[in-house]
Amino acid sequence: MKKSRITDLVGDPGHMSIEEFRENGYAAIDWLCDYFERIESYPVLSKVKPGQIKSSLPSSPPKNAEQFSQIIEDLDEIILPGITHWQAPGFFGYFPANASPPSILAEIFSAGLGVQGMLWLTSPSCTELEILVLDWIVEMMGLPDMFKSSGFGGGVIQDSASSAVLCAVIAARELTKTKAAPQGTQSYLIGYCSEEAHSSVEKAFAIAGLGRENLRKISSDSDGALLYSNLEEQIASDLFNGLKPFFICGTVGSTSTLSCDPIKKIGRLADLNDCWLHVDSAMAGTAAVCPEFRYLNDGIELADSYCFNPHKWMLTNFDCNCFYVKDKKTLISALSVLPEYLRNPRALDQPVVDFRDWQIPLGRRFRALKLWFVIRSYGVDGIREYLRGHVKIANKFASWVEAENDFELTSYTGLNLVCFRIEGDNARNEKLLNTINETGSIFLSHTIIDGRFSLRLCVGQVRVSEQTVLQAWEVIKTCASGIET
């Protein structure tokens, strides 16, 4: 019997031929290269109004196929004006979302291979490369060996630190339920974090069914670090009232100022009260690749889980979070659901890792590929040089601020985030921020420190240099000179 071609069965949907794909692929790379070359000519912060992009596009999908060249033309003329240019050297506002050339190219391979790595069986290379690369990172960053795959612990790539803390909360919840007497409700389980902790901790408690009111936000000191004595008192109070402390999130590098909680002291308290300790080092963690910044790891050996984001500062494009646990069996037990159609026959022959049991979704992308490309393309020494360069530039910027009479530092931890303000009230500083961002040449954000409106400048872009930061400083001073006191 003659075999039918797919086009005989479903018709030809208009696939590109291999040659068309090759030609269009070259065009796409050329477009990106041109974009990077001219990126400084665009306003860093998009100038479009809400709804402008949507109203510029057809309200209904095209009935017939369109040429790739037409799609690229619309990308240039309609989409690009609505882009805030995260890869621009003048983007200083938020923590960066690095997109280095090796990581971009790795994403092309990942998309082309089209891997769905939920099980070892569905792509052995996807699983085993992830295990290897995460072990590499333990070594690169001087993390505790308990996080290596060869022991009871291990690592997994999540999409973000938000997913990592959710997994940690669920694992802690389930572990506590197996130890505690049945209560019939989860309302007695109490968690703790600093008031400077990321908002994802509160969201995790809501999603996990624990309730936001069950998360105690502990006040911070003048440096933004959790006040240990207040945490100790709150735990004692909750125990006295018949509640069960079960989870503490420590922050190493807060979103607002890069402040760090006293992890070692918190870890001892967590152990004393049988609490799961999760350490969130989403931004600052990458700095530990440099031995001189390993103080950031102090106390992590006491953690049950730890995470950081290579997509922020390790030259790896979004999304990529490295999430480590001390005991992988606890995490798997909390998240595993095994219907018959997901049984892995290879697991009967010898143990294999099925990363679907380490995360919330079933499906998963081949994220390890871009980490592998980045680490091999730059080497550990290259990544260290990159990080040290950013810290050196941030140090210089902080010194410029300190030397200027009308300006003052409001927070600087010695890494790559500088918080500062000009003399005057909050309204004057807010006006300065708006004036700076309206220039289009740079983009800053703000935070409130001890009630004072402060501007944030984060040095972390792939294409940033001392010269671009010096130019930014000149823009800031020029704008400040026009703001009345």
Which role does the model predict for each range below?
Residues 137-167, 216-219:
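Short loop-beta-helix segment that forms the pyridoxal 5′-phosphate
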